[in-house]
UniProtKB/Swiss-Prot annotation:
It is found in: Cytoplasm. Residues 134-151 have a biased composition (Basic and acidic residues). One of its GO terms (biological process) is trans-translation. NCBIfam families: PRK05422.1 (NF003843), smpB (TIGR00086). It comes from Rhodopseudomonas palustris (strain BisA53). One of its GO terms (cellular component) is cytosol. This is SsrA-binding protein. Pfam families: SmpB.
Length: 157
């Protein structure tokens, strides 16, 4: 039997500040509807999702403010870099996410943009609640203490 040519997961863009600025409750993988030039530009790896978020419009979830720069080799057929992009989710997932956003005051933020094994662009979307300044300080103290604890254990052990 022939071997399948499976590609590893390739992370293209990551929102590193999200875990510091938000308390993440749940994550869901969503497909993202892109044009041809957008896919080529994303594969180049210049995409930023740090300032982006997801919002509901007309019963669908859209990715707002994600910057996918223009593809240099596509002259007049290029796309708009910050246009809203539709996220592909099941109806039950959309209802669950939008219910949490409306009732509990949560936010939908992207964590990662990557290509899966089949070469499809996917977005790891998080249902999160914004942290206050004192929560951020507490998280930083816990992280520093765990680092210090590791150093002490290595020094004594």
């Amino acid at each position: 039997m022939a071997e399948k040519n499976e590609r590893p997961i390739k992370v293209v863009a990551e929102n590193r500040k999200a875990r510091f600025n938000y308390a993440i409750e749940d994550t869901v993988e969503a497909g993202i509807a892109l044009t041809g030039t957008e896919v080529k530009s994303v594969r180049n790896g210049k995409t930023t999702i740090a300032e982006s978020y997801a919002d509901s419009r007309g019963g669908e979830i859209w990715l707002i403010n994600a910057n996918i720069p223009e593809y240099l080799q596509a002259n007049r057929f290029n796309h708009e870099p910050k246009r809203p992009r539709k996220l592909l989710l099941h109806r039950k997932q959309i209802n669950k996410l939008m219910g949490a956003v409306e009732r509990q005051g949560m936010t939908l933020i992207p964590l990662k943009l990557y290509f899966n094994e089949k070469g499809r662009a996917k977005l790891l979307l998080a249902l999160a609640k914004g942290k206050q300044l004192h929560d951020k300080r507490e998280t930083e103290k816990k992280r520093d203490w765990s680092k210090e604890k590791g150093r002490l254990m290595r020094a004594k052990g």
